[in-house]
Amino acid sequence: MTSWFLFFNNHATAQELQAKITINHNQIQGTDKSVFENLQQTLEQFVNERQWTNLKFQKNERIVCNFNITVTKYDQSSNAFTCTALIQANRPVYNSAYTSTLFNIKDADFNFEFAQFDQIEFNEENIDNQLTALFGYYAYLIIGLNLDSFAPMGGEDILQRCMNLTNNAQNLSFTGWKAFENSKNRFAIINDYLDGGMKPFRQLQYDYYRTGLDEMANSPERGRTNITTALQNDLKKAHEDKPMSMLPQIWTDYKKDE
């Protein structure tokens, strides 16, 4: 852990995330736009003002993330939203202005119910609301991935909370939470990530970011060498140990331009 990323100090804030939420409702005609505006404002407030963990982040250390939600269907009578979402999180690179993509995935079943001016509540031990479950899941996943990139397996506790939330969401009548539903749903992502066979993939997060990208400012040659080694060792072993997991392919897809 570096001196620029300290969790406990007197000047730190509680909030971990700095999320921008975009609601694209161009496909929905004849509906008062205010419901979408209220949804966007409610969600940004919920994600950004909540303390998700007991960790302390400096304001400039908060994890920048984006939720781009596209509404494909809206039923005003039942307050049901049918959506897809692109979720992305970024990580700063030490001693540079560069940011690297930490996480990027499309959730094709980002469906929920929301009535205008709803006050949304979240209790991770009692998951009874799809909307808060979705954002709780991605909040814990993003924070856990971020911690893994600063210390080997550093996000274990937070990622276990993500897994617990997923298990507690099994009774929700929405797609995406069930085991074996498909290989890229929310259950599959967190279950695979915590699987013992994916430890090399988790080690990759640390080796790629902390010993690779973060080292580039001090020694570009050493940084590039460490990145190459991480890809050749960690990524290759993760694929060999758990060939059916989609995680290495998802990671490679959003890293290919880097």
Where are these regions (language model features)?
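A cross-kingdom marker for long, charged
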Residues: 22, 206-258
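Start-of-domain marker
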Residues: 15-82, 93-95
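Short, flexible helix-adjacent loops and helix caps
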Residues: 52-55, 151, 240
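Second-shell loop/turn segments in exported
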Residues: 26-33, 121-129, 241
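Charged, compositionally biased boundary regions
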Residues: 155-156, 160-231
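Acidic/His-rich structured neighborhood in mature extracellular/periplasmic domains
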Residues: 77-188
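Bacterial Sec-dependent N-terminal signal peptides
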Residues: 1-17
